[in-house]
């Protein structure tokens, strides 16, 4: 008996498109974005029945609500990361200067009062199956800087509806030109001063989504997803050289972080203008050098940028 072929990850794709109306998949505007992995899925529990019928046989189970959610790991590329930043923070303020081939576009992403929704498609063209998730919003976004690993971002999403289609939602979707940023070309400022003693820095955004929105008539799917208050946290790991960083944590002194990635003429800058470190003293783990790890939380209080996070992407793409 012949063995049927199965879908290959190497031939699969993730395509995204921003929705004009929440939960409605567009037919144009699709972008095929590079990924490391994607595990978005719709899951539905089979719940046990508690019905008693006079014998010991179980009654048939019943189906629960459908949870559309999952995670993607994506590379941090000069062009493609802008789409995920837009999904998380909304339309950036963009400004283009110069003419090709010297054109530069600056895109500034801040925390706003609204949040876009998108359709995400996991496509398996070798078996003609296309999972299309509509009404999707980014629930969490995380970055890990430092070391010699490939620079990636984690994107957690929550969605409303899954459709299993035989064709892609946008046959004209374009693949993004991929040029990666690298940890090798990162610089960091702590408290406004460029430093070379920080080994790693994690920055995590939680967008506070409310997914408890299973309305009657929704056939088990969410009908809407409300964005909530954003929380920003992270951790820096630094050489323990003196008391400066530890004193900031002990005294609750406000500080800031600014991390920049550069690739050729293009940059990606993360700025947290106002943050405080959590008190966490170092210890002696052995004969090697001592490091200090300080968790932090960022917020907005009085900074002129009026946002707890300001992310600036400079590339040659005019709009997102």
Feature locations, PLM:
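Signature of extracytoplasmic/envelope-associated structural regions
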Residues: 1-320
């Amino acid at each position: 008996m012949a063995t049927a072929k199965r879908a290959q990850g190497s031939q699969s794709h993730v395509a995204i498109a921003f929705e004009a109306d929440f939960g409605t998949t567009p037919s144009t505007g699709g972008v095929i974005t590079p990924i490391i992995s994607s595990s978005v899925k719709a899951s539905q529990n089979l719940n046990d029945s508690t019905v008693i019928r006079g014998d010991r046989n179980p009654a048939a189970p019943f189906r629960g609500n459908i949870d559309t959610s999952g995670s993607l790991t994506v590379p941090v590329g000069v062009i493609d990361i802008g789409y995920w930043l837009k999904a998380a923070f909304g339309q950036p303020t963009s400004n283009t200067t110069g003419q090709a081939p010297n054109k530069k576009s600056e895109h500034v992403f801040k925390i706003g009062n609204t949040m876009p929704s998108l359709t995400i498609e996991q496509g398996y063209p070798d078996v003609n199956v296309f999972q299309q998730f509509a009404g999707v919003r980014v629930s969490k976004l995380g970055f890990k800087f430092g070391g010699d690993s490939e620079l990636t971002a984690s994107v957690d999403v929550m969605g409303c509806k899954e459709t299993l289609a035989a064709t892609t939602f946008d046959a004209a979707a374009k693949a993004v030109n991929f040029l990666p940023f690298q940890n090798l070309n990162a610089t960091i400022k702590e408290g406004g001063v460029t430093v070379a003693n920080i080994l790693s820095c994690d920055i995590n955004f939680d967008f506070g989504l409310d997914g408890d929105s299973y309305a009657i008539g929704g056939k088990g799917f969410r009908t809407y997803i409300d964005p909530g208050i954003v929380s920003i946290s992270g951790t820096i790991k630094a050489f323990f050289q003196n008391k400066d960083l530890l004193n900031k944590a002990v005294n609750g002194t406000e500080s800031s972080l600014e991390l920049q990635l550069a690739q050729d003429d293009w940059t990606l800058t993360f700025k947290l203008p106002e943050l405080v470190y959590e008190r966490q003293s170092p210890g002696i783990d052995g004969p090697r050098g001592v490091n200090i790890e300080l968790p932090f939380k960022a917020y907005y209080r009085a900074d002129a940028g009026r946002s707890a996070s300001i992310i600036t992407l400079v590339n040659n793409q005019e709009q997102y």
